[in-house]
Amino acid sequence: MKENFWSELPRPFFILAPMEDVTDIVFRHVVSEAARPDVFFTEFTNTESFCHPEGIHSVRGRLTFSEDEQPMVAHIWGDKPEQFRETSIQLAKMGFKGIDLNMGCPVANVAKKGKGSGLILRPDVAAEIIQATKAGGLPVSVKTRLGYYEIDEWKDWLKHVFEQDIANLSIHLRTRKEMSKVDAHWELIEAIKNLRDEIAPNTLLTINGDIPDRKTGLELAEKYGIDGVMIGRGIFHNPFAFEKEPREHTCKELLDLLRLHLSLFNKYEKDEIRQFKSLRRFFKIYVRGIRGASELRHQLMNTQSIAEARALLDEFEAQMDEDVKLEL
């Protein structure tokens, strides 16, 4: 194996969860500006497309990163071990520091085809994929869930994953069936850690699910002795979630992050071709907590260009109180 960056991380370390159509190079840089995590994962990259001579063009943008984001981990999915093998070799050449395998995506058209969380029901294939991915020489990690249908599946499934000698396991503390409709099962963290200690003490354990910020993550790490904390949806409510010394933030700071997002979208649009409308999902992150925010969001949703969005921000900020504090 090439250098294992996982062993050099602080304890506990913090990761921005991979999220489809969210954690691209643009949003990762915005989060980094607000408060940087220790590790970044890419969006989801399909191994079948990556290995196809034509499909590669449709996914390459998902793998765009800059050196200031290191250590960068490529998050990939599929169900053909040979495609994971080839993908891993190419990802190593591209400069990634690690590869993370998606065995937790609950979306129906993924899971029901035996991919993502569907691999929980195909443990032999999951093991083959893990071993095949090691061909690239990068540390291999897995992101998965407690089970597919029932919570009680966790012990057999995670025991099987731990036996594969992986660098890190990120466990979303819900089943595929639960999606994100119930509270994460924090009550299982201790038992999962005990299983890890018994089966694979050298595999790092990262928890994910309902963790809103670094403060909460530190409390869980101290209580249970886990190695890492992954924050996903919490970043939508608080882009400063990874802040080491939390402080009050102003509405203007959020709008400044939106301006940065717009600028970076322009900067990287040649590397990662996306339509302007893909930005709309982000507006609610930055525009809130101030009088007129709802109307501004509505207006931004109807814009068709970066220039239009900037003009609206200029007009809005000319009339706002820059010192209004946020309640995150």
Swiss-Prot record:
It comes from the Bacteria. Keywords: Flavoprotein, FMN, NADP, Oxidoreductase, RNA-binding, tRNA processing, tRNA-binding. PANTHER family: DUS-LIKE FMN-BINDING DOMAIN-CONTAINING PROTEIN, TRNA-DIHYDROURIDINE SYNTHASE. FMN binds at residues 18-20, 143, 208-210, 232-233. The keyword Disulfide bond does not apply. Disulfide bonds: none annotated. One of its GO terms (molecular function) is tRNA dihydrouridine synthase activity. It catalyses: a 5,6-dihydrouridine in tRNA + NAD(+) = a uridine in tRNA + NADH + H(+); a 5,6-dihydrouridine in tRNA + NADP(+) = a uridine in tRNA + NADPH + H(+). This is Probable tRNA-dihydrouridine synthase. Belongs to the Dus family. It is an enzyme of class 1 (oxidoreductase). Its EC number is 1.3.1.-. Catalyzes the synthesis of 5,6-dihydrouridine (D), a modified base found in the D-loop of most tRNAs, via the reduction of the C5-C6 double bond in target uridines. It holds the Pfam family Dus. The gene is dus.
